[in-house]
Amino acid sequence: MKQRKGVLIILDGLGDRPIKELGGKTPLEYANTPTMDYLAKIGILGQQDPIKPGQPAGSDTAHLSIFGYDPYKSYRGRGYFEALGVGLELDEDDLAFRVNFATLENGVITDRRAGRISTEEAHELAKAIQENVDIPVDFIFKGATGHRAVLVLKGMAEGYKVGENDPHEAGKPPHPFTWEDEASKKVAEILEEFVKKAHEVLDKHPINEKRRKEGKPVANYLLIRGAGTYPNIPMKFTEQWKVKAAAVVAVALVKGVAKAIGFDVYTPKGATGEYNTDEMAKARKAVELLKDYDFVFIHFKPTDAAGHDNNPKLKAELIERADRMIKYIVDHVDLEDVVIAITGDHSTPCEVMNHSGDPVPLLIAGGGVRADYTEKFGEREAMRGGLGRIRGHDIVPIMMDLMNRTEKFGA
Amino acid sequence: MKQRKGVLIILDGLGDRPIKELGGKTPLEYANTPTMDYLAKIGILGQQDPIKPGQPAGSDTAHLSIFGYDPYKSYRGRGYFEALGVGLELDEDDLAFRVNFATLENGVITDRRAGRISTEEAHELAKAIQENVDIPVDFIFKGATGHRAVLVLKGMAEGYKVGENDPHEAGKPPHPFTWEDEASKKVAEILEEFVKKAHEVLDKHPINEKRRKEGKPVANYLLIRGAGTYPNIPMKFTEQWKVKAAAVVAVALVKGVAKAIGFDVYTPKGATGEYNTDEMAKARKAVELLKDYDFVFIHFKPTDAAGHDNNPKLKAELIERADRMIKYIVDHVDLEDVVIAITGDHSTPCEVMNHSGDPVPLLIAGGGVRADYTEKFGEREAMRGGLGRIRGHDIVPIMMDLMNRTEKFGA
């Protein structure tokens, strides 16, 4: 039995709702997508609910689900993925957080991003914190880009049900950290101590003395949120399916999810996760990786951003760019030897300007696939697709089965 | 982001099977329903299994499921809903029962409804029981309509797994109460004592002395069944979804379910839950309530009765009356600002003359809805609908998501 390779392409936030400006079509229906339409003709469509019908998914929970894990059982916060995504090496019992450098004046947060402090300044401040703050557990504090940083408390995973101190708007004092159980109460106490001591170090740091003199907002306070630890999964993707798996991703959060479950992660030059990303660089990298890997996951972010920005025409254009990315891949593989799945991690309808619980159209084409009657890729056409309405966690098993890599249960 | 309002219309027992008398159509397919057909064109259809495929649902379990609760986890008997539905104020730890006044002669139940005793006589007898029966717990005993009454044991909710003493046919002695655990064993003992003492009070009551002289069956015994307590739900509907919710209902059992989960319940003049109900009074009330409420639930009962009575043409006529009720609502709202769902709580096929486990056609139309290819509302057309085949408990999350009232899980 021939084993096929798998290509999973996630166009972030792909699904949408009918839009007047597009004549009642969705961006995917409006866009000119000859390659995806061709794949729809020779393949099979359906709708997938990333988590369950009507439930908006986050990017992290949606990817966990699409990679086959029940997010209600596996998800334990975003921080761990963010930390992996910025290149930290973590242990499974570490607890990680997203951090903002912020400005505190007279007990009130006056700027949640410390005047968008530069990456260089932030890294220097992070170093000072790492060297001078003393708390009862080992920690890693690392600057990411701009005002963003990551905090890791070693060995504190059990306390992941801890809240945040971010008031989420300027003019308010920091929140006290909340907790849901004894283990996270301990973490909350450590975080309060950490924030207090970091404030002392930051407030008198030469970089902030200089910013103060220049009239710039000082980066003298830390806002900590998004506690997260290693997802509670029975087995890493690569072990579970016995495949060599690679991901082509630019966004830290999604990189982190892919790393956490065993993918080798690549970010080709030019891939940014922003509107200006180089999708053809991703296509070339994917084709190259298909030589060595059994399963390649390609993530395309900007479709989601266009939904958040309520820009239907831009979303349609980005889908057309994604179509060209997919064409390059299709042109460089033998479709008999590959199973290609294309979907979104969730819907980000322009009218909602956020993730929604609408199902996401799904396309599977390649070797072994039973073609249905569908003619093009789109929300309405997917409703009559042969895959029916499935859950996000069904996608990978269906792919692996078409790839002839599943195992029989029973005799 | 605009938040929409929701209208959920339940045509009780709507689903049916093909009927020779209707040329092989179902009553819904046979009926002339221009408004629902219009909504099907601009909206989306599907099939919903109230509980799960092939499983007939009761009206209480079906409504619990459609309101988003798993009835296998949440349902704890019907009595509580009946008691709420007849206007009793209950605490969450109360245990309630449906009661019949019945006739006992020589140790045998000779009439399960005591000659359909009048409401006035029954209320007088109920008063005598309330005043003269002494058992080890506080109780409320209240006459409803005709031979029907309600019993509430205060604070005894834990014992809801108690059986009944109703032999369900005349000529048999009352059953002893059964039980499934220690808490319900105690309730069974209390009920045996209650029934015995009530029998003593009733048997010598002047009303029964008079009935005996007139040759009428005496109402000297109580048949107690349908033990029920507050449903085991994580949160009331109104709290869970942060909406102000109203119900337009006439039937006690469904009223009770709606009250239990936080709805304000209205029964406009003329709404009876019988064939003679005034559906236009319901429509007007619903439109009025939409000014103040975020979510309005309208229940239409007689379609179910026509199924129980195996009267296909009457069922079709009732569906046409429901269509006019829906037209009034559609004419008085802006469909861009509202999400309307129409379905049944279960199928009541004429050939079955009872609830069946057939899936129920479902229609959703209004703002944000992705239209599918369907053209009219009916069982067969629903099979190719874009909603696919979902569960009853998916309906409200899908509505709330289109109403832009859901919250993201994950980051």
UniProtKB/Swiss-Prot annotation, chains A, B:
Pfam families: Metalloenzyme (PF01676), PhosphMutase (PF10143). It comes from the Archaea. GO terms for biological process: glycolytic process. Pathway: Carbohydrate degradation; glycolysis; pyruvate from D-glyceraldehyde 3-phosphate: step 3/5. Inhibited to approximately 20% by EDTA. Optimum pH is 8.0. It catalyses: (2R)-2-phosphoglycerate = (2R)-3-phosphoglycerate. Its EC number is 5.4.2.12. Keywords: Glycolysis, Isomerase, Magnesium. InterPro entries: Alkaline_phosphatase_core_sf, ApgAM_prokaryotes, Metalloenzyme, Pglycerate_mutase_ApgM, Pglycerate_mutase_ApgM_sf. The keyword Isomerase applies. One of its GO terms (molecular function) is metal ion binding. Disulfide bonds: none annotated. The keyword Magnesium applies. Its cofactor is Mg(2+). Catalyzes the interconversion of 2-phosphoglycerate and 3-phosphoglycerate. Homotetramer. Belongs to the BPG-independent phosphoglycerate mutase family. A-PGAM subfamily. This is 2,3-bisphosphoglycerate-independent phosphoglycerate mutase. The gene is apgM.
